[in-house]
Amino acid sequence: MMRQGTSPSKLYLPKIKDAPLTIFEYVCKKFHHIGTEVWQKRFNDGLVKDLDGRVLDLNSPYQHGMTITYYRHLCDEVVVPFEHHIIYEDQTLLVVDKPHFLMVSPAGDYVQQTLLTRLKQTTGNPHLSPAHRLDKDTAGLMIFTKTCESRCAYQSLFNDRQINKIYHAIAPMTQAHQFPLQVLLPLVRGEPFYTMAVGAGEPNTHTDIDILAVSEDGKLAKYELKPTTGKLHQLRVHLNYLGIPIAHDSFYPKVIHRAKDDFDKPLQLLAKHLSFIDPITNKPMAFESGFELDFSKV
């Protein structure tokens, strides 16, 4: 059952040595970073239940093999003042244009202000699930599956690289490289941990890059990016590696911390086009984002 557009999280209670007396004690230790007062409020508000829907309280005993469900406490979130747009829907698919600054799925400090929660609220469908990733800072096309039965088929398209993806990005114009070109790099986790870096060894990422347009003053270019792999931050790292970091990138070449309500400088990266053969109907599908990147906004 959904609550304000969010589905409950599930937690299995394992058999452990020196098990706590209560479920409350266990979750407080397991999720110590959350805070005892937060869990106390969840129990007091009736947000923690067993799989049969029975409400658990602070004194409910710990029983290994049991599965509990709980809703994250919805704190006051910074409202993302940009709207998504549904551009296609059928019995199994929902294709959406995601604005900049909006996370796809709940994580960290974001629950309500995510695309998935918004869609669950407006459609009433608790089975919606993203078929792939898209950074919070990136705008453009997102595919969601509408049924549990279809989820694996569409996620496999991305995992098996059966999707044609085209991105647009605005970055400095350069004479140091001749376009079109290919970038093949080995990417690894960077420092801080939420960034990526160029490592050693065989390349595990591949992007074809070309120039679509140049600004009137010749300082900026709009690049067309065609990744054949889908590593985290791949396009951002590839352009930064070429010495042309994407405009308004707060991670590359260096991390810049911005306030959560700072919406002035969106990352100039857009998931513009997706095409594939539908695994259910075997029909060719192609979608284009209605958003555009504009030199005047940089």
Segments the model singles out, each with a brief description of its role:
Residues 1-298:
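RNA pseudouridine synthases
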